[in-house]
């Protein structure tokens, strides 16, 4: 990852923090004065399975730098105290994401041939290209039809339940930003006590419904007959 990419990542995340602050002000939070911790560096810990002699250590070091900078931005610039977010929980969550990313590539011989699929990768074009409708959480496959071999050919998925209060906040964030990137979704998930997957699915479905509504209005407008 080049320096320009890192600068773009930090710019996006910093911008999102400011949007969250503006939203908090609109909702009545008193954010006068920045009570965020003084700026200081944070570093991800290495999984115990990895050492400096690992053949992919150079790649892992770059990945660690990406996580370090993202964590620093969140902890130093995102007004965690005002938004009642626990910094310790955020650190633990990002550390787990980092460990999973490292271990995913631990046994790959030629890391240069692998596309970076780290959970902290930021928006690519396909993430905001909605090609399906009403997506459910595919990580939770229902096995209620295990006695029916025909039905088993078509697995069903459990719908993720989101509380009414959380949906209201998601709706407000959607008005600010319709396609949050991976770190932003993680930040929102921490605030609302959801999983990043639930947040991603909600925004995907919301964009699909908004797009369908806009398309429908345009079609009706074109088909409307005006008196001559």
UniProtKB/Swiss-Prot annotation:
Query: Its biological function?
Result: Mating type proteins are sequence specific DNA-binding proteins that act as master switches in yeast differentiation by controlling gene expression in a cell type-specific fashion. Transcriptional corepressor that acts in conjunction with ALPHA2 to repress transcription of haploid-specific genes.
Name a GO CC annotation attached to this entry: nucleus
Give the compositionally biased regions (Basic and acidic residues). 120-140
Q: Name one Pfam family in it.
A: Homeodomain
* Gene Ontology molecular function: any one: DNA-binding transcription factor activity, RNA polymerase II-specific
Q: Which organism is it from?
A: Kluyveromyces lactis (strain ATCC 8585 / CBS 2359 / DSM 70799 / NBRC 1267 / NRRL Y-1140 / WM37)
Assembly and binders = Forms a heterodimer with ALPHA2.
Identify this protein by name.
Mating-type protein A1
Q: Superkingdom, according to UniProt? A: Eukaryota
């Amino acid at each position: 990852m080049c320096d320009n990419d890192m600068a773009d990542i930090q710019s996006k995340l910093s911008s999102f923090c400011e949007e969250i602050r503006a939203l908090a002000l609109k909702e009545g939070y008193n954010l006068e004065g920045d009570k965020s911790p003084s700026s200081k560096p944070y570093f991800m810990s290495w999984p115990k399975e990895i050492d400096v002699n690992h053949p992919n250590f150079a790649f892992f070091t770059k990945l660690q730098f990406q996580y370090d900078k993202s964590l620093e931005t969140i902890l130093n610039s995102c007004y965690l105290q005002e938004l009642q977010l626990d910094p310790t929980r955020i650190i633990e969550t990002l550390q787990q994401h980092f460990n999973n990313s490292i271990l995913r590539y631990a046994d790959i011989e030629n890391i240069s041939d692998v596309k970076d699929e780290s959970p902290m990768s930021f928006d690519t074009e396909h993430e905001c290209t909605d090609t399906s409708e009403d997506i459910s959480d595919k990580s939770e496959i229902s096995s209620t039809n295990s006695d029916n071999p025909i039905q088993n050919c078509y697995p069903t998925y459990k719908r993720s339940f989101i509380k009414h209060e959380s949906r209201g906040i998601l709706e407000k964030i959607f008005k600010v930003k319709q396609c949050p990137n991976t770190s932003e979704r993680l930040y929102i998930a921490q605030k609302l006590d959801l999983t990043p997957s639930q947040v991603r699915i909600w925004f995907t479905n919301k964009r699909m419904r908004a797009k369908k509504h806009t398309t429908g209005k345009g079609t009706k407008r074109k088909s409307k007959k005006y008196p001559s």
